[in-house]
Amino acid sequence: MATPTPRHQETPQETTERERCEQWTDELFRTSPMVRFMTKHLSLLDCNPLSPLRTASSSSHATASARAQPKLVIAPCPPSIAGGFSPSLRSEPTSESSILLCSNRIFSKAHLEDTLSHEMVHWFDHCRFLVDWSNLRHHACSEIRAASLSGDCGFVREWQRRNYGFKLQHQNCVKRRAVLSILANPACAGDRQKAEQTVDEVFQSCFGDTRPFDEIY
């Protein structure tokens, strides 16, 4: 996961982008129905993204130091991503996961809402189902759910990507986004055929699983 630039080393542009992302994030946690809903259901699983970090008094000093970072990390990123999910280590509670928000890749509050919601679905899956992220089928299932439920494949986002279409556009977008994510998994080794096959194998069951929603948002 990207590491935030120390504030005294930020360029003026990085400072502006970080502060804008921080403001939008605060506003979304107060006003976004989607973000508030996901926060509620993460909290029910003891994975509240806004809860205090663990301290050395509740863990070994080494472990606490290794994970001494906010649960919502705002930092500059490479051009290919807008956010990410960093799952907890196997030896840690699932609540010790974190979300990356790429301050230089978020172009609007709506984009941030979709990105944050996408990563919160991953966190929900990690807390609820104990996902093995090295298992391509597990990873594909969570990517399918996150792309489908978060708004990442909404009409406006697809139009902005210049993916024009109407028939099965949502499903096609979900598959495409899931395949791209699986390709980045070291267990896939960049094998597109393997990524596409894995997504196809789990698509129907995972696309139909809308938990914690009653239906697609």
Curated annotation (Swiss-Prot):
PROSITE patterns recorded: ZINC_PROTEASE (PS00142)
Region (Disordered): 1-21
BP GO annotations: mitochondrial protein processing; mitochondrial proton-transporting ATP synthase complex assembly
Alphabetized InterPro entries for the sequence: Peptidase_M76_ATP23 (IPR019165)
Mode of membrane association: Peripheral membrane protein
A GO cellular component annotation in the UniProt record: mitochondrial inner membrane
Predominant localisation class: mitochondrion
Top-level class of the enzyme under EC nomenclature: hydrolase
Top-rank lineage group of the source organism: Eukaryota
Keywords: Hydrolase, Membrane, Metal-binding, Metalloprotease, Mitochondrion, Mitochondrion inner membrane, Protease
Active site: E119
Pfam families, A to Z: Peptidase_M76
Function: Has a dual role in the assembly of mitochondrial ATPase. Acts as a protease that removes N-terminal residues of mitochondrial ATPase CF(0) subunit 6 at the intermembrane space side. Also involved in the correct assembly of the membrane-embedded ATPase CF(0) particle, probably mediating association of subunit 6 with the subunit 9 ring.
Identification of the protein by name: Mitochondrial inner membrane protease ATP23
Organism: Mycosarcoma maydis
